[in-house]
């Protein structure tokens, strides 16, 4: 299967691209055809055949990560060529083997700081005027933003919904 790894490497975070991609090659979905789509504000001339650079504006952190779903939807034609896509924070590493068990329409990561907490303790958006509003007593899990993905049609639909809101 064809897999696309998405990440944002702006400002000083460009230094983490190589180590992330090395850990992906070593531990993530071995045996599959893996490519990367790197969103960056740096001028990069030489990249390998399996890495595509998408140039974005230079903006201070955390603006680029807040705009991630905007970037993804602008590259929907490219991302749609893959069987699965996964966003990974560029400063993470894959330390253990991850196999086909990760495949799903949409995949997300439970936030480790909230694993054993009751949903009343989750830091959901509680302002009713927000499009991210979760009423008291609702919600099942609290998700981390550093890793998510799935089949492109589902991932891009989710991304577009986030952009629209």
What are these regions (language model features)?
Residues 123-140:
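Short, flexible, basic/aromatic active-site loop/helix in glycosyltransferases
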Residues 137-165:
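Catalytic core and acceptor-binding pocket of nucleotide-sugar-dependent glycosyltransferases
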Residues 17, 47-48, 96-99, 159:
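Short glycine-/acidic-enriched loop or helix-start segments at secondary-structure transitions
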Residues 1-64, 75-81:
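N-terminal anchoring/stem segment of glycosyltransferases
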């Amino acid at each position: 299967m064809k897999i696309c790894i998405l990440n944002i490497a702006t400002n000083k975070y460009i230094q983490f691209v190589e180590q992330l991609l090395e850990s992906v090659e070593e531990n993530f979905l071995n045996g599959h055809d893996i490519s990367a789509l790197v969103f960056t504000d740096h001028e990069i001339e030489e990249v390998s055949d399996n890495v595509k650079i998408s140039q974005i504006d230079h903006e201070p952190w955390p603006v680029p990560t807040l705009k991630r779903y905007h970037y993804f939807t602008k590259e929907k034609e490219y991302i749609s060529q893959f069987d699965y896509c996964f966003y990974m924070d560029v400063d993470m590493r894959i330390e253990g083997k991850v196999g086909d068990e990760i495949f799903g329409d949409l995949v997300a990561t439970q936030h480790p700081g909230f694993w054993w907490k009751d949903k009343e303790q989750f830091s959901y958006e509680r302002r009713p005027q927000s499009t991210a509003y979760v009423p008291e007593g609702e919600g099942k899990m609290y998700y981390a933003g550093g890793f998510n993905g799935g089949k492109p049609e589902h991932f891009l639909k989710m991304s577009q919904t986030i952009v629209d809101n």
